[in-house]
Amino acid sequence: MRIAGLLEGLSPPAVLYLGCWSGYCAIRLVRACGMGFPYNRRLSSIILSLMIQQIRNIAIIAHVDHGKTTLVDQLLQQSGTLGDRFGPVERVMDSNELEKERGITILSKNTAIQWNDYRINIVDTPGHADFGGEVERVLSMVDSVLLLVDAVDGPMPQTRFVTQKAFAHGLRPIVVINKIDRDGARPGWVVDQTFDLFDRLGASEAQLDFPILYTSALNGYAGLDEKVRSGDMTPLFRAIVEHCPPPQVDPNGPFQMQVSTLAYNSYVGAIAIGRITRGRVRRNMPVTLVKRDGDEHREKIGQVFGFLGLQRIEVEEASAGDIIAVAGIEAPNVSDTLCDPEHVEPLPPLAVDEPTVSMTFQVNTAPFAGRDGKYLTSRQLKERLERELIHNVALRVEEGNDPEKFRVSGRGELHLSILLENMRREGYELAVSRPEVIFRERDGEICEPYEQVTVDVEERHQGGVMEALGSRRGDLKDMVPDGRGRVRLDYLVPSRGLIGFQTEFMTLTSGTGLMYHVFDHYGAARQGGIAPRRNGAMISNSTGKALGYALFNLQERGRLFVKPGDEVYEGQVVGMHSRENDLTVNPLKAKQLTNIRAAGSDENILLTPAIVFSLEQALEFIEEDELVEVTPRSIRVRKRHLKEHERKRAGKGM
């Protein structure tokens, strides 16, 4: 009826023209309105209104590893957007090398699919709360969310995090219960848990009235009945079209768009991505760029890109409601506003949660510095961190009194370790300190961050895990046995109590436990410290290649981090002592050879395999007087003071 009302009074040729548009081709109709048809301005307005009615902007949010990226693969494939030339796809949205290795989404991505006459812009967001800065800024571009929940696990801590963000933006959810074909699926329980979660988060009546779909993203089917085991994704496409509202935007007003994320192309430079909230944009159009601090610059749009499938497609013009990318803007930042020069109206800056964890990044001063990396100096380190700040909105970098040290703060250990991993792959060498939580003062009271922790363990490991979390000042909030030999424990734990806990947890549960944690709130700081590492370090007293004979004699004292032939230096931690104290050792000691024939035969040297740390494990292991040396080829643990007499002097001064 609405469309019929819009068409009333138009000439037959104009009505005929409206039947042939699809996707971006509708832009050409707008530009063709000067062909002599009557009511051409009205025709232009009607076409734009119809275009907007056919757009859906939706984000997929969920807990890590519940199947977001796999679901996007199926939507792209079954909509026909990719076409036959792409063949079968697998996690196409995880384009980053680290994402494919770890099986997690780190950066939010944009794509668009054509389904029937609808254009559906999809944003795939990270599930880890450490990348919450990504989640928060992309929610400003969409009108609804697909909330993906595992049919066995139900809502998890990070489901709560991203859902809370969506509700704060006033978005209505479409609940998708994924992995419905998984053994032990309990969709009824999951729906109840999801409803309870929404209620606790203060959802409105409209947000509580959510549609539910049951899917298997891996097998490519969806349905309205929990017993569905075949079919395709049509029910999900239909639900998106029916329950996600079209963008509430003004297509005829002066141009306005907020930059939500950034990309980079070596040919065109920085690319600003966002949703047009008002008006239209075309190539070579003059605009005003308003920075977060209110500073204004005149710029000119170079190129305009739309999203389709896996590609960015250059278009002549784009209209309000669509998610686009523009090139040609000099040094854009997230939260900047692009406006019509005659109507400069900046949008409110995007709010991002403050960091909770900090580390010190410093120049590598170890004896082997410069052997592996290309970028070593404080100037190169500073430039790299400043580049990261442009698009990593949840990151903070501060310079201290020492020009070779930078205090880097982020949303969690994973957030910072991903940055470090990217830097070492780019050829950077640096040393980093143990992660520390950030304390804040509120109303005269010192507060620290608390995290909601969910652990899923076998019942035989329950006692050890509860004792360990208790010693780290955790409060047990809930305990739910699943009736099949496992139990889920919910805790509230100070963030500093979780630093270094992951490795201990995996040891306690023999590798069978699952642990998830997410920032909850800042609360009153608890008195006393967290118990330090129980084992001391074995520290090398010389520089050279480690020898098997020396390591064979040292392994009685603890676990080794090096193997025969590895180069070590004075002050490097080469093992974990079996006792609490540090021990200075000589891993270079060779067997003394004499000209006296021994009565017995030599002992066969049998070495226990050395512990090889990942970056996260090394950061968890170190104490305050230690650093992790990060290079493109190696991850080493070392003491801050490499010489033994320096360590003794520092120890006396403490």
Enumerate the predicted regions with their spans:
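Accessory interaction regions appended to the cores of large information-processing enzymes
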Residues: 209-211, 238-242, 272-654
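Conserved Switch II/interswitch segment of TRAFAC-class P-loop GTPases
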Residues: 129, 140-160, 172-174, 180-188
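Residue-level signature of catalytic and energy-coupling elements of molecular machines
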Residues: 65, 71, 103, 122-124, ...
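Short, often N-terminal, low-complexity regions
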Residues: 3-7, 12-13, 34, 38, ...
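P-loop NTPase switch module centered on the Walker A-proximal segment
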Residues: 47-149, 153, 193, 262-265
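Canonical P-loop GTPase G-domain recognition
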Residues: 183-241
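Conserved beta-strand/loop subsegment of P-loop NTPase cores
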Residues: 145-148, 170-179, 202-216
